[in-house]
Amino acid sequence: MAKKIRKIGIRKGKRKIPKGVVHVQATFNNTIVTITDIKGEVISWSSAGSCGFKGTKKGTPFAAQTAAENAVRQAIEQGMKEAEITVSGPGSGRETAIRAIRTAGLGITVLKDVTPIPHNGCRPPKKRRV
């Protein structure tokens, strides 16, 4: 008769987190949505790539919408009601991700754009010649 495998470590139960922060990082190639509590501990995350999109489809607004819905659904299951949103990056999924967060049922308290803008820092990549 086989022995039962005992699990080692502490199992995290469902936490009740009423407030949090939704970080949306929208690049040209992908959109990553991370939801944290006020202290900064990650509750849930999702990206266009983890939702099943591949290649150039990861940079589309629909992929960003799907990623945001998946992350928010997991956060609402843990009791989140409202959140701040910080948006970073120049990608096409910025507005769609914010819209998806609102329609998924999460209240928005603050909306911040934290895209890093250089004060003439690094040299940008060369222009494309098509």
Curated annotation (Swiss-Prot):
Its main location: plastid. One of its GO terms (molecular function) is rRNA binding. InterPro entries: Ribosomal_uS11 (IPR001971), Ribosomal_uS11_bac-type (IPR019981), Ribosomal_uS11_CS (IPR018102), Ribosomal_uS11_sf (IPR036967). Disulfide bonds: none annotated. SUPFAM superfamilies: Translational machinery components. It is found in: Plastid, Chloroplast. This is Small ribosomal subunit protein uS11c.
